[in-house]
From Swiss-Prot:
<keyword id="KW-0479">Metal-binding</keyword>
<dbReference type="GO" id="GO:0008966">
    <property type="term" value="F:phosphoglucosamine mutase activity"/>
</dbReference>
<keyword id="KW-0413">Isomerase</keyword>
<dbReference type="Pfam" id="PF02879">
    <property type="entry name" value="PGM_PMM_II"/>
</dbReference>
<comment type="similarity">
    <text>Belongs to the phosphohexose mutase family.</text>
</comment>
<feature type="binding site">
    <location>
        <position position="247"/>
    </location>
    <ligand>
        <name>Mg(2+)</name>
    </ligand>
</feature>
<feature type="modified residue" description="Phosphoserine">
    <location>
        <position position="102"/>
    </location>
</feature>
<dbReference type="GO" id="GO:0004615">
    <property type="term" value="F:phosphomannomutase activity"/>
</dbReference>
<feature type="active site" description="Phosphoserine intermediate">
    <location>
        <position position="102"/>
    </location>
</feature>
<feature type="binding site" description="via phosphate group">
    <location>
        <position position="102"/>
    </location>
    <ligand>
        <name>Mg(2+)</name>
    </ligand>
</feature>
<dbReference type="GO" id="GO:0009252">
    <property type="term" value="P:peptidoglycan biosynthetic process"/>
</dbReference>
<protein>
    <recommendedName>
        <fullName>Phosphoglucosamine mutase</fullName>
        <ecNumber>5.4.2.10</ecNumber>
    </recommendedName>
</protein>
<dbReference type="InterPro" id="IPR006352">
    <property type="entry name" value="GlmM_bact"/>
</dbReference>
<feature type="binding site">
    <location>
        <position position="243"/>
    </location>
    <ligand>
        <name>Mg(2+)</name>
    </ligand>
</feature>
<keyword id="KW-0460">Magnesium</keyword>
<feature type="binding site">
    <location>
        <position position="245"/>
    </location>
    <ligand>
        <name>Mg(2+)</name>
    </ligand>
</feature>
<dbReference type="GO" id="GO:0006048">
    <property type="term" value="P:UDP-N-acetylglucosamine biosynthetic process"/>
</dbReference>
Amino acid sequence: MKRRYFGTDGIRGQSNVFPMTPDLAMRVGIAAGTIFRRGNHRHRVVIGKDTRLSGYMLENAMVAGFTAAGLDAFILGPIPTPAVAMLTRSLRCDIGVMISASHNPYEDNGIKLFGPDGYKLSDDIEAEIEDLLEKDLNAQLAKSDDIGRAKRVDGVHDRYIEHAKRTLPRDVTLQGLRVAIDCANGAAYKVAPAVLWELGADVVTIGNEPNGTNINLNCGSTSPVALQKKVDEVRADIGIALDGDADRVIIIDENGSIVDGDQLMAVIAESWAESQQLRGNGIVATVMSNLGLERFLDERGMALARTKVGDRYVVEHMRQHNYNVGGEQSGHIVLSDYGTTGDGLVAALQILAAVKRTGRTVSEVCRRFEPVPQLLRNVRISGGKPLEDIQVQKAIADAEAELARNGRLVIRPSGTEPLIRVMAEGDDRAQIERIVNELIGTISNVRTAA
């Protein structure tokens, strides 16, 4: 069944435009609060946000919704998404909320929900919330004497700082390393530099002056040019680029080259396998991860399990099959020994541990495999279902047959935008470009005809 509100990572959209309005945010609070208001204990919700201008508006709306449903609301202010997941558990809350649109520009915002175990909600529970949102919620309001209380909680940043520091092996310090970090003017602008400094690094920070409208603006993991320049300027050993809510990371090596999530997963998998920390004898990634990663792992006797796009699906597969390393090419790295969702800072600390233990440079540590040529293009759609068209399906089948075992083809609708994503990869770059261009043309023709 097609969902109206939830996408691959919660609810997301332009602020003050449906569905990302204060009215819907309040209704989500009532609906989600109703579902998690079970048992006789006093029910609680923890609410965090990033640094977007609209965060204050949506935070107040969600506090109103949850307290109207009878839950006490713990308000955290700007804090990373993985910290919200961690605090949902440690504060014994029934549900956790992160108000963020991750790597999107400030005009957008979103709502991510976590269960009491710190994991993102399942499709089934999100469907329950959607079902309630379509009904009259007045019947779900708490009695007058059961309305929840709202409280701003102090000291939560220190809790997350200590949690992140504990993920670095105790025999490792960051002394002697110059680390440049770009906080994307986002949720980690205070905590990330503090963690690195307390672990001994010489820290150079950019993207740590949020003003409500500059989150992810020419900074962060999706725009690493500023960090590349800073690494060169200060001769840093490594650059760490987080996104707006700090659940993803991209590394810049000492030469200014970008290291994506696939390479980071390869480093962590190999390092953890050597220390016998790796579970499942492999890792979990999405269909978008490079074929080079799969070959790298296979050569070392490790497996790559693939899921559909979205870190929540990576986490679900990890939980079901006892893996402890997973992630996405985009830099969502999930290390279940340390958390329940992607954590850019914790992932970066594992890379720093490998650098310190081996005594090698970041470029030497992080270039674990040669990626095969990969091309991703998007087709914007305004309606219809072009992937169900017979001509498109035949073109896809022909392309898959041509690639055979020498490449891969992934075609899927975006979970957050009105786009169809076409990705192909293989050893022959010219072949890949031709296949993608032909498929784009076929899909565009069908869309135009419709």
